[in-house]
Every structure is written in C-alpha cells, then in structure tokens.
C-alpha cells in the first residue's frame, strides 16, 4: 500500500464520510479538497463556481490539489477533480486511488438537488450525461474500484480489503 489514499467519485458517492472513517482507522490525516477550496476562498463551493465560472473553478481546484502534501493522508477529492489530468496524475503518483462507484440512480437518491453542491456541468448537459462522462474518467485513474451501494460500513470494509 502507498502511504496515502485518495478517494474519487461523484458528489454523493461517500468520499467525505468514508474518508473520515478511513483516516480515523488508519491514523492518517484527512484532507477534503472541497473544504480546502471553501476555506481558501472563504465561500461555499457553489459561490466559488457561480462567481468564477467553470474554467476558473477547475483551476482553483487543481491548485488546491497540487498543494496537498501526501504523508499518511486520506484525500477526499471533489467530484470534478478528474477534469485536471495534471492533478489526477499528481494524486496517482502520491497515493492509491480508490473510485467509489455508485449507480446513477443511487446518486440521484442521495443528492436529489445538486444546485448548491458546486457541481460542474454544462448548462445543456443532463445529470445522467454528466455522470456517464465522469464515470469513464474515474475508472481510468482508479487503482481500485469499490462499489458503495450497501452502506458506509460495507464500503469501508471493502476498501480495507483492497489496500
């Protein structure tokens, strides 16, 4: 196992919740890139997105990720981190990357309203199209794919079995 773990996946996949549990169990530092963006910008993710636009938001997210110092770290990434190959290559070279796979139906049940999540998608893009677009990218960068459809404890145990 690499000395750090990064969790990737859609908004609502459980990255922050599972990241917290993993970090506590492994005695690693938890870094949540969404929280770092909010702290650095002193605004919510949605405010950062609305005020800066998609391209600038991606740049801010990339800079935050590239600033992470991996040392026994669990990184819970924002759902759009995968749009920066530079950031994802940095993550992959410094950690084991785990894709928390969740079906589109489950994501929509967990997060019925994305309007305040700082979720990046084109105006004319449906949520399902955004989900499908991201899924192949998550798979491309993942060292391990763990399905999170049976609850937090089950997903946590699956991760422990692959790291």
Model-derived segments and spans:
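NTP-dependent small-molecule kinase module
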Residues: 2, 17, 21, 25, ...
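Hydrophobic anchor at the beta1->P-loop junction of P-loop NTPases
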Residues: 7
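P-loop (Walker A) phosphate-binding loop of NTP-binding proteins
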Residues: 10
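Conserved glycine(s) of the Walker
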Residues: 14
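ATP-dependent small-molecule kinase phosphotransfer cores
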Residues: 33-81, 85-89, 132
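Short, well-ordered alpha-helix to beta-strand connector turns
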Residues: 71-72, 94-95, 141-142
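Short glycine-rich anion-binding loops that position phosphate/pyrophosphate groups of nucleotides
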Residues: 78-81, 103-105, 151
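A glycine- and Lys/Arg-enriched "phosphate-lid" helix/loop adjacent to the NTP-binding pocket
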Residues: 94-136
């Amino acid at each position: 196992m690499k000395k750090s773990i990064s969790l990737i996946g859609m908004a609502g996949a459980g990255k922050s919740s599972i990241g917290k549990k993993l970090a506590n169990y492994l005695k690693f530092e938890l870094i949540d890139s969404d929280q770092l963006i909010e702290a650095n910008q002193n605004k919510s993710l949605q405010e950062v997105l609305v005020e800066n636009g998609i391209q600038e938001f991606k740049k801010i997210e990339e800079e935050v990720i590239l600033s992470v110092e991996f040392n026994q770290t669990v990184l819970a990434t924002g759902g759009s981190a995968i749009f920066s190959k530079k950031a994802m290559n940095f993550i992959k070279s410094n950690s084991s990357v785990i894709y928390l796979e969740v079906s589109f139906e489950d994501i929509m049940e967990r997060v019925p309203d994305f309007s305040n999540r700082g979720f990046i998608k084109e105006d004319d893009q449906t949520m399902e199209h955004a989900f499908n677009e991201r899924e192949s990218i998550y798979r491309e960068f993942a060292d391990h794919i763990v399905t999170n459809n049976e609850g937090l404890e089950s997903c946590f145990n699956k991760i422990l079995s692959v790291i």
